[in-house]
Structures are given as C-alpha cells and as structure tokens.
C-alpha cells in the first residue's frame, strides 16, 4: 500500500460537445443519487445548455453541494451539467473499476466539503479535489477489492428490489381488497388523547 493523491491516479476529463447533441443521454445533478455508485437515471433529448462530455467508465462527481454525496460511474457516453466534475482513471495507476468506490466515500466527501467555496451553493474545484490523499494497494489487490465491492453493490441492489417487491405485495394483500369496499355510514367513535 502506498499513499497517493487523487490527481496522481485520475484526471479531470475535459471534453466539450460542439456539435449535435442528439442521441446523447443527458445527466444533471438531479440524476445523481446520494451515496449510490451507479448512475440509474438520465434524460434523453437535446433541449438543454449542457456541453460537457463524459465517456463510459468516467466517474461523475457532483461538485456543487458536495455534502449531498453525489458521485456515480457512467455506464455510457453522454453530456452532463457543468456542476459535475468528470473524473477519468489513469489505468496504469488505478484500476478503473475501483475508482468509483474511491470517489464515493465519506472521507473524500468530507475533504470536498472542506475545500468548497461559496455560501449559497458551495462548489469544489478539481484543483482542490485532486489533492485528496488515500491508501492505494497494488493492482492485484485493487482487482480483488473492485470485484468484492461490485459484488456487494449488486447484493445491495438485489436486496433493495426484494424490499420494493415485498412492499408491493403487502400493499396488494392489505390495501387492494379494501379499495373497493363501501364504508359509507360506518364510523368509529373518536377519543381525545391527552
């Protein structure tokens, strides 16, 4: 393990869409879910003012109001808000599959909040974010960590789907049968609680 700065293993991806935006998914801050490492929402269409490009595998970091902990890996190429910093792994220094988990962690967000400027809508710049220091293992261990973390993320998502399905089942079993009943004229006495 060695201590590295984020800017030694990743760069800010700076690419601008100068032509037609048709066909590119659009990502705004509202699409980044706090504390989620994967991007699951975006808009389609070209009716926006965004011009910042990102590529599949880049990490999209919500630089405005960093305390909201918004950062996710892009599953496709697209265009994003100027309030998103696009971070690209340097593959011979850090495994690109591990970078999203390095970014999406409390210590990095605490660092980002401490380096943010502005009172109403504080923003952190890449120039400050790139100085975040962390321990980084060798490539073999990075691969092991990435596999484990992605497996944990998949398990978490499966669990969330199970909870949602269970919630729907409970609603259908208890609320559904009562939805078509006529309760007019049937009242229960009310008591005042002190």
Protein language model annotation of sequence segments:
Residues 1-17, 131-147, 154-194:
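Non-catalytic DNA-recognition/assembly elements of restriction-modification systems
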């Amino acid at each position: 393990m060695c201590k590295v700065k984020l800017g030694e293993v990743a760069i800010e991806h700076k690419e601008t869409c100068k032509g037609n935006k048709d066909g590119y998914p659009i990502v705004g801050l509202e699409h980044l879910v706090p504390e989620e490492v994967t991007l699951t929402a975006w808009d389609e269409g070209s009716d926006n003012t965004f011009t910042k490009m990102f590529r599949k595998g880049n990490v999209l970091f919500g630089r405005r109001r960093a305390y909201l902990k918004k950062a996710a890996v892009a599953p496709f190429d697209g265009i994003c808000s100027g309030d998103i910093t696009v971070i690209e792994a340097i593959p011979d220094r850090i495994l690109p599959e591990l970078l999203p988990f390095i970014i999406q962690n409390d210590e990095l967000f605490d660092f980002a909040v401490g380096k943010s400027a502005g009172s109403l809508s504080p923003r952190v710049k890449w120039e400050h974010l790139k100085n975040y220091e962390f321990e980084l293992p060798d490539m073999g261990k990075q691969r092991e960590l990435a596999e484990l973390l992605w497996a944990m993320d998949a398990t978490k998502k499966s669990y969330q789907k199970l909870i949602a399905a269970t919630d729907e089942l409970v609603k259908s079993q208890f609320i559904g049968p009562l939805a078509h009943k006529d309760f007019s004229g049937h009242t229960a006495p009310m008591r005042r609680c002190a």
